[in-house]
Regions:
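Short terminal alpha-helical segments
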Residues: 12-19
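Short amphipathic alpha-helical segments that mediate assembly, nucleic-acid/protein binding
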Residues: 10-11, 27, 43, 188-191
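Conserved binding-pocket/active-site segment within a compact domain
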Residues: 129-132, 146-149, 154-159
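Structural detector for internal amphipathic alpha-helices that build alpha-solenoid repeat scaffolds
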Residues: 1-6, 16, 24-39, 44-51, ...
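Intrinsic low-complexity, intrinsically disordered segments enriched in polar/basic residues
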Residues: 2-5, 99, 156, 190, ...
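HEAT/HEAT-like alpha-solenoid repeats
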Residues: 86, 142-150, 183-196
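Short, Lys/Arg-enriched segments at the junction into DNA-binding effector domains
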Residues: 113
Length: 225
């Protein structure tokens, strides 16, 4: 649904439908409708849904927040519930999908400390695809370095699904580490060394991680033995 044809009354009606839902199915369907509108006016309600015990509705809410994009970020950050693990986990997924740098600290913390492998996996992917181009050069470099550091530390994660996503995140981040910048060559070297370490890890339990690291290195034109 195009936001250009939605009036405030339309958005309010969609929000009220979510608030009035009296069954799991009703909540899911109402959330889907609100998410499909992708209107910033529905962001607060979608964030609220993240805290409900309804995974289907939460998935729809995350999709809606990602569709809204940057206008939803402040609402997500302001309303992250530190006492509701489920809501926070879904919020991490939304921030990872949006890719706004305002979510950097949350993604760093999630990759390093979250108890859920699926949340750490989402954070790893998110750290690799933050939208850095609009930033000033110095801020872009500093942000890329923070993403790199978090991902390098994530190489030691105990879950292979997270390590796999770290590989994806590192490969996605690589273009932001421009070799013509002062720190670029050293940062790229760290990134390549992290990928090589994952490729050569003799204790890796999941060969798919090694294969994905090899593919990333091949795409980067880096010899890895």
């Amino acid at each position: 649904m195009s936001t250009s044809v939605l009036t405030p009354d339309h958005v309010n009606a969609l929000v009220e439908a979510v608030q009035r839902a009296d069954s799991a199915l009703g909540l899911f369907q109402a959330t889907q409708a609100l998410a499909a509108a992708a209107h910033p006016g529905g962001a607060a309600c979608l964030v609220e849904v993240l805290g409900f015990n309804n995974p289907g509705a939460a998935v729809a809410a995350v999709d809606g927040l990602i569709a809204i994009g940057e206008p939803a970020v402040d609402t997500i950050l302001t309303n992250i519930d530190g006492y509701n693990y489920g809501a926070r986990a879904w919020a991490v997924r939304a921030l990872a999908g949006i890719g706004d740098v305002r979510g950097l600290e949350v993604l760093e913390d999630a990759l390093g400390n979250d108890i859920g492998p699926s949340v750490r996996r989402a954070a790893a992917r998110g750290l690799g695809q933050l939208k850095l181009d609009p930033l000033a050069p110095s801020q872009r470099r500093a942000t890329a370095e923070r993403c790199l550091q978090a991902l390098v530390e994530g190489c030691r994660d105990g879950e292979w699904v997270v390590r796999y996503s770290v590989v994806v995140g590192l490969e996605s981040l690589a273009p932001a580490l421009h070799p013509d910048q002062a720190e670029g060559p050293a940062a790229q070297q760290r990134l390549h060394e992290a990928l090589i370490g994952l490729r050569r890890n003799p204790t890796e339990e999941a060969p798919v991680v090694q294969l994905r690291a090899a593919l990333a290195l091949q795409r980067r034109g880096v010899s890895h033995g």
